[in-house]
């Protein structure tokens, strides 16, 4: 056995572990050979350790896998300030690993020191949770605690807050905690930013509302113009209708006046036609009602002088006429009629006489006697004409007053 191995056996077990770790880090200088290491391990264990049941292979593999698991916390790795960039490869001979129950405290203390050194390195497979599950206690480095505290105590300001602070000429520290004055300044700045945003929102809403109002005003203005034009057209139509109504009223009044005058004219015409037609109809009816044995002689005579001067003359004329001449005229075929000037009809009755072939001619020129208002008519019927009455003739004298 070489003197290096004797020195290792003379050292304390904790010092031997530390020395072995240093030798491995320094490139295995003064490293003992494998048999020496085995001998030293055997010497480290007490006689009672030989009686302890050795760990099985799968338990050792489980322990190694837990130590070499890749689930390492990124925060711990990122915040590590260690400058060691190489990995540590630890190889433990499985056949020489044995744990005594009486030395659990020593192993835990030694493992704590080893894990403390490993945690400070950039070992990518270190998992603190797995170590804690296995019974190891992991303590973070002071540098990591400082980095986490610095990140948590750092004051984060937005761009608007920075601009407003620069505009007001104020400065705030980048670390926490802040003083009361600084907190008031920060609150005031943030309140201004909130008010600014609220004002912007209100202005935006107001602008939208004003735009809507302007559009509505334009719309209602156009409608108002259309309604005004419509009202003007309706007023013009109303005036034209009023003019037409006045014209119609004037026409109705004129038509009413014309109707009254026309009706009057029509009534006058109807009355005149009645006056003209009724006598003609009456005369035709009277002529149709006269029997065949009556002969009508119509003659209208007018008296030239006045009636008052010649009123007593008819009686004188009648008295002057001799009875003999009257009887003589009655006995003869001559018939004398004394007729007043107001009467013009003389009826001659011949009930049993035969109707002549033609009307006899009246000879009035030789036998007519005019005496003022009285007219003496004489009718001569010659026997040669063949129409003679079978009865005695009668003398009819009509007298009347002339009403001029």
UniProtKB/Swiss-Prot annotation:
Pfam families for this protein: bZIP_1
Motif stretch (HCFC1-binding-motif (HBM)): 87-90
Gene symbol of the encoding locus: Creb3
Sequence ranges assigned to domain bZIP in this UniProt record: 185-248
Molecular function via GO: chromatin binding; DNA-binding transcription factor activity; protein homodimerization activity; RNA polymerase II transcription regulatory region sequence-specific DNA binding; sequence-specific DNA binding
CDD domains (UniProt xref): bZIP_CREB3 (cd14689)
Feature type site, description Cleavage: 301-302
Tissue localization of expression: Widely expressed.
Motif (LXXLL motif 2): 64-68
Domain of life: Eukaryota
Example GO BP: positive regulation of transcription by RNA polymerase II
Region (Disordered): 305-327
Keywords: Activator, Chemotaxis, Cytoplasm, DNA-binding, Endoplasmic reticulum, Glycoprotein, Golgi apparatus, Membrane, Nucleus, Repressor, Signal-anchor, Transcription, Transcription regulation, Transmembrane, Transmembrane helix, Unfolded protein response
Quaternary structure note: Homodimer. Interacts with HCFC1; the interaction is required to stimulate CREB3 transcriptional activity. Interacts with CREBZF; the interaction occurs only in combination with HCFC1. Interacts (via central part and transmembrane region) with DCSTAMP (via C-terminus cytoplasmic domain). Interacts with OS9. Interacts (via leucine-zipper domain) with CREBRF (via leucine-zipper domain); the interaction occurs only after CREB3 activation and promotes CREB3 degradation. Interacts (via C-terminal domain) with CCR1.
Record-annotated membrane-spanning stretches: 262-282
Protein name: Cyclic AMP-responsive element-binding protein 3
InterPro entries assigned: bZIP, bZIP_sf, CREB_ATF_subfamily
Motif (LXXLL motif 1): 19-23
């Amino acid at each position: 056995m070489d003197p290096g191995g004797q020195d290792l056996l003379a050292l304390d077990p904790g010092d031997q572990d530390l020395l072995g770790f240093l030798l491995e880090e320094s490139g295995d200088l003064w490293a003992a050979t494998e048999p020496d290491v085995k001998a030293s391990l055997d010497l480290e264990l007490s006689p009672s350790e030989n009686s302890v049941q050795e760990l099985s292979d799968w338990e050792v593999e489980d322990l190694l896998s837990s130590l070499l698991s890749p689930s390492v916390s990124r925060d711990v790795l990122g915040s590590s300030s260690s400058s060691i960039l190489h990995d540590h490869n630890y190889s433990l001979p499985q056949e020489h690993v044995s744990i005594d129950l009486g030395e659990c405290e020593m192993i835990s203390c030694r493992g704590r020191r080893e894990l403390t050194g490993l945690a400070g390195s950039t070992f990518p497979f270190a998992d603190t949770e797995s170590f804690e599950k296995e019974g190891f206690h992991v303590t973070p480095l002071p540098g990591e605690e400082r980095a986490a505290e610095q990140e948590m105590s750092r004051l984060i300001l937005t761009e608007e807050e920075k601009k407003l602070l620069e505009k007001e000429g104020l400065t705030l520290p980048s670390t926490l905690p802040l003083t009361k004055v600084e907190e008031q300044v920060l609150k005031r700045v943030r309140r201004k930013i909130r008010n600014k945003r609220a004002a912007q929102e209100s202005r935006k809403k107001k602008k939208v509302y004003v735009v809507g109002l302007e559009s509505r005003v334009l719309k209602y203005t156009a409608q108002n113009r259309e309604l005004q034009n419509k009202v003007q057209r309706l007023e013009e139509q109303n005036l034209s209708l009023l003019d037409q109504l006045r014209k119609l009223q004037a026409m109705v009044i004129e038509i009413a006046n014309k109707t009254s005058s026309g009706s009057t004219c029509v009534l006058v015409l109807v009355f005149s036609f009645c006056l003209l037609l009724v006598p003609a109809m009456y005369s035709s009816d009277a002529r149709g009602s006269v029997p065949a044995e009556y002969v009508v002689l119509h003659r209208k005579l007018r008296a030239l002088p006045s009636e008052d001067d010649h009123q007593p003359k008819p009686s004188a004329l009648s008295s002057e006429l001799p009875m003999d001449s009257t009887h003589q005229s009655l006995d003869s075929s001559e018939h004398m009629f004394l007729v007043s000037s107001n009467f013009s009809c003389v009826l001659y009755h011949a009930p049993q006489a035969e109707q002549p072939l033609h009307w006899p001619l009246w000879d009035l020129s030789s036998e007519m006697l005019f005496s003022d208002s009285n007219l003496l008519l004489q009718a001569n019927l010659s026997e040669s004409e063949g129409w003679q009455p079978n009865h005695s003739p009668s003398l009819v004298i009509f007298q009347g007053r002339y009403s001029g």
